[in-house]
């Protein structure tokens, strides 16, 4: 009997004494049930519909171009026009390159494909309505000039970074805020339950993924209880992020429990421009004075409920105080846009300021400067990338990074390599166990260039690191939802917190240092690859912006 089969039996049946032939049949039945379940799943139906639409579109374009020269000429002119349009857009050069290459390779079909699924050109109605929702909170997000002057007097370098966030994202920097860093999903879950139970007035939650299980079921039970007590409880989840984890129209089931709920950007199985723009944020706001954000979704995977990818490494942060209002604003802006179809309400944003119920919150120590920020694909400002670039380019001693995916453009890659070449201690932590094989392979394709530049690259050997962290010089850090990949930096709704001179900075540093110790450092020898693998890496890097 082969070693692989023996391993298969043991894995499936926990080393029982089942006869090998019977075990093989049982394993086959188990696999068949999984296949049948997948064929009945919403994901399979959606994927099939998209493939059929894509095939029909391609076949139609090819047929028309083959038999009608005028149509062929129109498609070619369209592709040329699209190429010129792409070149003149304010997109990342790598994103432009992959689309221009694709269009030039398939000129008849490429231009049409870009117009349908490429780019980030949202409908005017979509942009206008989101901006209108933002206007409602804008006047309450004005920068306190005294805080700005105090930060500038303390550190002009940090003041410049903060000023960029204020101008690009329209969120001010605050004092009078406590920050508490949580280095795992388990720590976040424990603190989340504690804070939810204390809620007296309202709870706002916004997540990319929710999945039935211990974590979400526990949270849902509390939300239902609080809604029954008369609290304003609102839940928002991304319809694509939760495509495989909750049933179809799950938002309606949640509303039946007395909880206001909407699915962000409801997914329709059609080739569409809006398919790319997902809500990757993770936000919890409780009574205006307390907020959470970070990498964790509401699913058991994030609290190591099951070892799908080995040990799951997570990072979250809690804010208590004035800075919480920025997250309240982010939530209400998005809620206002999508909730109109379910709820008729005129929101008085003053009611949600942290000062309204601050006296009821447990007093905690305030320190330093805290600046939450949001990033939206509906404008031409890549705020999250700007935050990362500012942190990297202004570092003098060290830059410690954790990211589940490292698939970046030339600007961020060059900045990181230049910092290392300038003598800054640059370290990057990525997963050892892949959740998406092709993205993991693309991440590894950057290793050689990084290591040659002097960057110390580590893989988290216990499993999968999902933290999104940057900490610099024992002074400043950012914790949030933003992966170092094209989707997070250019296509998704994201958020994070910039933290300066707060105990959370040291906590992030200590967490990363201890995690580096149990991770494998990548050497130049590890990055060697044969001809075929180098070719694969080249292709992966070329198409990285589409991942």
Q: Model segments located where?
A:
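N-terminal localization/anchoring segments of enzymes in phospholipid and broader phosphate metabolism
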Residues: 5-385, 390, 394, 434, ...
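Glycine- and other small-residue-rich loops at beta-strand/loop junctions that grip anionic moieties
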Residues: 208, 404-405, 439
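A short, conserved beta-strand element enriched in hydrophobic/aromatic residues
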Residues: 314, 402-403
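Helical hairpin unit composed of two closely spaced alpha helices linked by a short loop
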Residues: 395, 405-426, 431, 436
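Short, solvent-exposed amphipathic alpha-helical segments in soluble enzyme
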Residues: 415-419, 445, 514
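C-terminal structural cap/anchor segments
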Residues: 424-484
